Amino acid sequence: MMKSDEFVANVRKSAEDSFTSGLYCAESVVLALARAQGIESEILPKVATSFCGGMSRTCGTCGALTGAIMGVGLALGRSKAEESVAPSYAATQKLIKEFEQEFGSRECHVLLGCDLGTQEGQEMFREEGLRVQCTKFTGKAAEIAARIVSESNS
């Protein structure tokens, strides 16, 4: 069994590698967390696509964070109505709190300082190299989620 620190580092690297290879934030994070749990499916990045760019460029929650929430759900969520939501909810609340403490917000447009739903915002994103910031959000969201999942399973 992989040590917790190694598990967390591998998930972070996997998410960052997927992001720098062309997948977007939510896609990269959920895929990294799924693979770390031995889950392989082409459905996962598809499910996450519309969460990228702050909920499809609507100034919503950061896609890296929503991808991490989906990954937590894969590990701790329920598959039957009689199962408890408590483990997944508690882990998700902790994830959101830590992400907000780290970056000061959970909202894409606040984190980046631009609205990706506008032409001006997209130009600012490109011209100011803000994708580098998204790589950081992607890696950290994956790291926090992996640590929380690892702690919950130990």
Predicted regions and their residues:
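Polybasic, low-complexity association/targeting segments
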Residues: 1-21
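Glycine/serine-rich anion-binding loops at beta->alpha junctions
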Residues: 51-70, 74
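Phosphate-handling active-site elements
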Residues: 36-47, 74-94
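C-terminal binding/interaction regions
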Residues: 3, 91-154
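A short glycine/serine-rich beta->alpha loop
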Residues: 13-20, 52-59, 126-132
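Short cysteine clusters
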Residues: 25, 62, 108
